[in-house]
Amino acid sequence: TITTDRVFRDVSSWYNIVLRIKTSESSDDDKYQIWINGLRETVTRSGTPVTTFLGVNSQIHNVLKYPNGSSYGNVYLSDMNFVDGLALDASYFGEFKGGVWIAKNPDVSNYGTNGFRFKFDKTGLGTGSASTIGADSSGKNNHFDSSGIAAEDCNMPDSPENNFATLNPLHKGYASTPYSKGNLKIVGTGSAGAATYSTVASTMELTGKVYFEVYINALTATGRTSVAIVGENYLMNKYGSVSTVGISGFDQAGDLAGVGTGDD
């Protein structure tokens, strides 16, 4: 396992992560190097060396799967590259522009025998091919199979070039609220007196005109759901009372509510 000292608190941001492994180096510091958004991080390794099965034909390779268990990371991926046989640093995958790290088209001419590049721009599922979510665009045709994913979650418009405003799971409500679909979907508990709520993350404009829509997928007979823009100096109490600048209620599943502000 390789870890860094960095903490990842901004759930609305995309991160560009580059891992360089060079087994010929003697120290872990030189053998394992990680850059996050163009900056090299301090790393710590524990347990079995990660290179034991990496890129080996006879081994099953999983994307975002936890090493012990059957769970997977609950994140979006925009571009994933594995270069077999070369130890490349972050400059091959991004660059600084105006002080901001920007991912670029990888400067890689040959991905090696078992290398691959996933752009995640297809919606096909199942056995890997050039038309599925696991399509390899490196030219090596190392397509990955997929399972446990819906077509609606593939090739999402939310991307580093078009970063969506999302709900913020760090803003805790009265009741436990599971977030999914890249923090675009929440499910309330439905218990009496419990309020499910969240603020929109920092990618939402703080000035000017703002508009967003919310779709209700399912609603219990006794449930009452509404959506609003709440002033930063207001609090929601445990019964769900709020002070707002705009509010819309849902009567049944299938309702669509639009909320906006008219500030210039």
Residue ranges and their predicted role:
Residues 1-5, 176-205:
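Secreted extracellular polysaccharide-interacting domains
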Residues 45-52, 70, 102-109, 189-204:
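Surface-exposed ligand/attachment interfaces on beta-rich extracellular proteins
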Residues 189-255:
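Secretory/extracellular carbohydrate-interaction modules
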Residues 1, 34, 64, 96, ...:
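Aromatic-rich beta-strand patches that line glycan-recognition/binding surfaces
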Residues 26-28, 40-46, 77-140, 147-160:
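Extended recognition patches within non-cytosolic domains
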Residues 1-50, 259-264:
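Extracellular glycan-interaction surfaces
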Residues 54-77:
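Extracellular glycan-interaction patches encoded by glycine-rich segments
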Residues 17-19, 63, 77-81, 118-119, ...:
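Short hydrophobic/aromatic patches on beta-strands that form ligand-binding or substrate-lining surfaces
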